[in-house]
């Protein structure tokens, strides 16, 4: 089983369960997290400047948002609680309840998408890479936080923003016990404006552009990080949701992580996993409790959005 994944990049979800006992033993230090003791800066003050509590989220190509995306947006607004929250679109989706809710939760701003490879303007980016480059450009210019639309914030990030351990922090991903499978997953990324690591990451696209889905944004990004220690920190508590053996393992994960990043949430295998574990229902309860506690009486439209999300998760997950 281990030989099947050793040194290979996975192109599809592996059979359930993902980790064999041997893989679990070897990879545990990479993704298993200690309980979070509490909020606030630990030890001495950070030597790095604080990161702006501003969230930038692109929504490109004009597609329709799903209710799980709205749950993610509610988690950003009411659990992360940024000072500003912007949703950038290049082409407005058709009017729909989800688009209306999205623009109630965040400030929707039209913004052109990057279509050319950074540093190589003669080469066009694949459309699925537009958001990857755009997130780096927005964070480089403004600083702040990027949260992908399949990620759900379940615990405050205030201490990381106030006392960052590096100018850039992102998710850690390891899809097998092989060191070659390590990735910097930018599905959740915190960054100071003008961070050197962001410039290096953007430059790496121009030098080594690949049309593979995540080679530049994840695999190549980890190589850049490894070559420049101290400029970034990769963290398992900001990384993608691992695949666990039991339902209890998934719920124990909620006690250890800050974000549930359910990558590939539109794929059947992931939806089956979330349904079987009940994990998204647990996330829904955390997020809607925070949202309903914060919403005022006048915010009846937002309350209606939250109610629609709750009913959708009950029915679908």
Regions found by a protein language model. Name each.
Residues 1-131, 149-317:
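Glycosyltransferase-associated regions of secretory-pathway enzymes
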């Amino acid at each position: 089983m281990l030989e099947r994944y050793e040194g290979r990049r996975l192109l599809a979800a592996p059979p359930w369960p993902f980790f064999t006992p041997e893989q679990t033993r070897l990879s545990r230090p990479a993704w298993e997290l200690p309980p979070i003791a509490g909020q606030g800066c630990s030890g001495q003050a950070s030597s790095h400047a604080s990161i702006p509590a501003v969230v930038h989220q692109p929504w490109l190509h004009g597609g329709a948002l799903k209710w799980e995306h709205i749950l993610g947006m509610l988690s950003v607004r009411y659990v992360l609680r940024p000072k500003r929250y912007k949703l950038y679109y290049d082409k407005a989706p058709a009017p729909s309840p989800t688009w209306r809710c999205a623009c109630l939760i965040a400030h929707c701003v039209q913004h052109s998408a990057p279509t050319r490879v950074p540093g190589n303007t003669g080469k066009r980016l694949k459309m699925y890479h537009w958001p990857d480059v755009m997130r780096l450009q927005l964070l480089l210019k403004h600083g702040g936080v990027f949260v992908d639309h399949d990620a759900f914030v379940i615990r405050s990030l205030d201490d990381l923003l106030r006392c960052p351990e590096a100018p850039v922090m992102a998710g850690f991903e390891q899809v097998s016990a092989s060191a070659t499978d390590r990735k910097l997953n930018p599905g959740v990324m915190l960054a100071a404006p003008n961070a050197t690591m962001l410039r290096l990451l953007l430059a790496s696209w121009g030098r080594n552009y690949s049309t593979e889905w995540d080679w530049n944004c994840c695999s190549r990004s980890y190589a850049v990080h490894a070559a420049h220690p101290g400029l970034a920190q990769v963290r398992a508590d900001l990384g993608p949701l691992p695949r666990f053996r039991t339902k209890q393992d998934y719920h124990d994960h909620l006690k250890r992580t800050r974000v549930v990043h359910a990558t590939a949430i539109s794929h059947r295998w992931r939806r089956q996993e979330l349904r079987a574990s009940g994990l998204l229902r647990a996330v829904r309860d955390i997020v809607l409790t925070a949202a309903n506690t914060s919403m005022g009486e006048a915010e009846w439209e937002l309350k209606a959005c939250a109610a629609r999300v709750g009913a959708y998760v009950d029915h679908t997950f």
